[in-house]
UniProtKB/Swiss-Prot annotation:
It is found in: Cytoplasm. Keywords: Cytoplasm. Residues 205-220, 248-265, 518-531, 642-659, 755-771 have a biased composition (Polar residues). May negatively regulate the snf1 kinase. The keyword Transferase does not apply. Belongs to the SIP5 family. This is Protein sip5.
Length: 821
């Protein structure tokens, strides 16, 4: 039984689904761009449910359609908005072309003529209604040029945007025929007769029907009689219909009543002539110039309510209120001190954004508005409700100048008095843009959000700068307590080691804001002293969340900027320290180099020739100053240095003082006669020094035996000429010992280097007395300068040799003193 019910319900379900798809496609046609596609997909899915068709490739079209739908749904919001704006622009262009082709008001248009290319942000519906009511001038076509001598067909060509023909040539498209006066009188009589026979006043009858009758070539008796059903239907049925609508509007909703209250637009008689002239020629024969856009329009322009200046409708709809801004008086005294605080003053200014009414562009009178006096005829669109309070506009009388009796006559005189902004005939800029209040409210809300962000920045700045100052001065007792708890109880000003305190304080501030109100409402004073006490109102919860989120973001940005600034300062400090360290090293190096130069200068001063009367320099001074060059010279003396010490002795000789020439003058003949000329071009080598090791050791033992006498070492080194004789004997002994040990010519090189060591021990040099050429001395100097410094063992041996030389010098001095005595 259940199966039979299932079998019975299945077909009905499929049929109902098909019917629902059909109904849905029929009802949703034209409303949703995706409705047809969804319905077609539903039907396709029913058709392609068979698996065998999907195997053959005939099915699966629904999958492709679903993929196409998903692709359409993936478009971004910006793309949808751009597509919507493009569609709206195309629709506006099409509607504008249609309106200019089919609609007009007294020869003017209901859409702009392209004088201004900006955004049309005025309310187009309100402007259209005001133009149809003849309270605002229509958008006349402006002429770039105008001449009073133009003929009618030239005026028609200029008004229609065609090239202006010559005065004596009428183009075929501008030819017209004046309506015969007989036909006009017949139409007038027929309309008067029809009006007299009508028993019910014409209230809401469509004027298009009457215009068709008036413009038809049928005689007056062709009109239906009032007793005919057509006439009764046209005259009485609208009346009963309006009563029914009135009764129905009392019981219907507000929306229906608003729709019914909108006045109905009617088409007035289509008559292209006014007083026998084409309507274009009648309008533009006395054209005037708009003082703002400098185009020529018919004389029926808007007039300012204050100074009675003409202004076209396109210029009028461009004038609007200024954007919301703070009051001007607040800008003047913005520098004045505000005891309430800078943040509160800024909040008050942001909340008090104002937008003054537009001022007159001519006399700068506020509450700018215009008044419009329409032409004495009526053409185009009108409202059906206007016929009750005005003369019958459906009659041909409206096409004549007799209608001007019901309106204010247009004269050349200007209005002597200004009209009030609340006058019913005055149209202000606020009426054209009634959304100015909403824009002001939006601007104030935006300013409030910006003020909240500024407050967050100020709060973050205060929290970051409050490390060095106490929190009790500004009433942040509870905030400071929370910060102290987060910072480990360190709340004393100037506490070191609080690098993360700004972030902790900021988040402590936010945590304190989110805390329940019971923690902060214990004391009224504490509650009023808080910067931003928590608000628990459910109505403003979203605003509070937004404000706190903005505050957290502002604090994060502020902390990031502060961290970046601190890193930059540390980097600058490190660079400065490196620069100072480099300068200090450079100065130390320069000082070291200057000290070395001073030592060289002192040594060169010692090497200069001295007077023979000066005392001799002791050997202790020569052991302190290092030598840098080997002075050239000859002499016969015993080599007292080992092969490893030869280079050191050669370099130390230059620092010792030069010996006066009187000491060695007697020695030169004997030295030159006892030994052959030396070869100074070859530098002294350790191989040459090995030959004099026995002589050095024997002479050292001799000197040690002689130095045991205590009286000799204590004698002063004095005497000038008498010291030459013992030095003579000493050099002769050294030469004899050297001759015994030498076996080849290499001994000459050793003897050549012996005077340098002798002069080092005795602090006297034979550099100034040698007969060697300058080239040889230069070679010896260059060879000595290349040698390296001695090792530790060589320096010790050198010091021992210097002591031996000193004792030998003392022995010679003592012998010299004994011989003289």
């Amino acid at each position: 039984m259940g199966n039979s019910q299932t079998k019975e319900t299945r077909p009905s379900h499929s049929q109902s689904s098909r019917r629902s798809h059909q109904w849905g496609s029929g009802s949703s046609h034209g409303r949703s761009p995706y409705g047809d596609r969804h319905n077609s997909e539903g039907s396709r899915s029913h058709r392609s449910s068979r698996p065998d068709l999907s195997i053959l490739g005939l099915g699966g079209s629904s999958d492709r359609d679903v993929a196409t739908i998903l692709e359409h749904r993936r478009e971004t919001k910006q793309e949808r908005e751009a597509r919507r704006l493009e569609k709206e622009r195309a629709a506006r262009i099409k509607e504008r072309e249609r309106s200019m082709r089919e609609e007009h008001v007294d020869g003017g248009y209901l859409v702009t003529q392209g004088v201004y290319t900006g955004t049309e942000d005025f309310n187009k519906a309100i402007v259209r209604q005001l133009m149809i009511e003849r309270r605002l001038a229509p958008f006349w076509r402006g002429l770039n040029d105008f001449s009073d001598s133009w003929t009618e067909h030239q005026l028609m060509a200029a008004a229609r945007g065609l090239p202006i023909p010559p005065p004596d040539e009428i183009p075929p498209e501008l030819e017209y025929r004046n309506p015969p006066k007989v036909v006009e009188e017949a139409k007038e009589a027929s309309n008067i007769q029809s009006v007299q026979h009508l028993m019910v006043p014409i209230t809401s009858r469509s004027a298009s029907n009457g215009s068709d009758v008036s413009h038809s070539s049928q005689p007056a008796h062709s009109l239906p009689s009032p007793s005919s059903p057509i006439a009764s239907g046209t005259s009485s049925s609208p009346l009963f219909r309006s009563r029914a609508k009135t009764l129905a509007s009392l019981t219907t909703s507000r929306h229906n009543s608003q729709v019914d209250s909108t006045p109905q637009e009617i088409q007035l008689p289509r008559d292209p002539f006014v007083n026998g002239q084409p309507i274009e020629a009648y309008l533009y024969k006395d054209a005037i110039e708009c003082p703002i856009c400098f185009l020529y329009y018919p004389p029926y322009l808007n007039r300012t309510r204050c100074c009675d200046q003409p202004i076209c409708s396109e210029c009028f709809v461009q004038i609007k209120r200024p954007d919301p801004h703070p009051p001007e008086h607040a800008d003047s005294d913005s520098n004045a001190p505000n005891p309430a605080g800078e943040t509160e003053r800024q909040d008050v200014q942001d909340i008090q954004l104002v937008s003054e009414p537009a001022a007159c562009p001519f006399c700068v009178q506020p509450e700018f508005g215009v008044a419009y006096v329409p032409p004495p005829f009526r053409r185009g669109l009108a409202y059906a409700s206007d016929s009750s309070g005005r003369p019958n506009i459906g009659t041909p009388v409206s096409s004549t100048s007799s209608l001007s009796s019901a309106t204010t006559p247009t004269t050349g005189r200007r209005r002597a008095t200004s009209l009030s902004a609340t006058d019913p005939s005055v149209i202000t800029t606020d009426k054209v843009r009634p959304d100015w209040a909403q824009k002001l409210a939006n601007a104030r809300a935006h300013a409030a959000r910006r003020s909240a962000a500024a407050t967050a920045l100020h709060t973050a700045a205060y929290l970051m700068n409050s490390n060095g100052s106490g929190g009790d001065t500004r009433g942040f007792s509870m905030r400071r307590g929370v910060m102290r708890r987060n910072n480990g109880g360190q709340d004393s000003p100037g506490t070191p080691g609080r690098s993360g305190s700004p972030a902790l304080q900021a988040f402590a501030f936010l945590t304190d804001r989110r805390a329940p109100s019971g923690q902060e409402t214990d004391s009224a004073e504490e509650g009023t002293s808080n910067l931003a006490p928590p608000r628990n109102s459910s109505r403003r919860s979203r605003m509070d969340d937004l404000e706190e989120m903005m505050m957290m973001e502002a604090i994060r940005l502020s902390l990031a900027s502060e961290e970046e600034r601190r890193k930059r300062e540390e980097k600058e400090l490190r660079k400065e320290a490196k620069r100072r360290e480099k300068e200090a090293k450079k100065a130390e190096k320069m000082a070291r180099k200057a000290g070395l130069y001073s030592n060289n200068a002192s040594s060169s001063a010692l090497e200069s020739p001295s007077d023979s009367r000066l005392p001799k320099v002791t050997s202790s001074s020569s052991s302190i100053i290092g030598e840098e060059r080997t002075p050239p010279g000859k002499g016969k003396a015993v080599e007292r240095v080992t092969p490893s010490q030869s280079n050191v002795d050669l370099t130390e000789t230059a620092s010792s003082g030069d010996v006066p020439s009187s000491f060695l003058e007697p020695q030169q003949p004997q030295s030159s006669s006892s030994l052959g000329p030396p070869v100074p071009k070859e530098p002294s080598k350790p191989s040459h020094l090995r030959h004099v090791s026995s002589a050095s050791s024997s002479f050292s033992s001799l000197v040690e035996s002689m130095s045991e006498e205590p009286g000799l070492s204590a004698q002063p080194h004095e005497g000038t000429s008498s010291s030459a004789e013992p030095l003579f004997n000493f050099r002769s002994l050294a030469a004899v010992i050297g001759d015994e040990d030498k076996s080849d010519e290499a001994a000459e090189h050793v003897e050549d280097t012996a005077p340098h060591t002798t002069s080092e021990g005795s602090t006297s040099s034979a550099a100034n007395l040698t007969t060697a050429p300058a080239g040889e001395s230069a070679v010896s100097t260059s060879s000595t300068a290349v040698e390296k410094g001695p090792t530790v063992e060589e320096s010790q041996e050198c010091s021992v040799n210097k002591e031996i030389e000193t004792r030998s010098m003392e022995v010679t001095d003592s012998r010299n003193s004994e011989t003289t005595s």
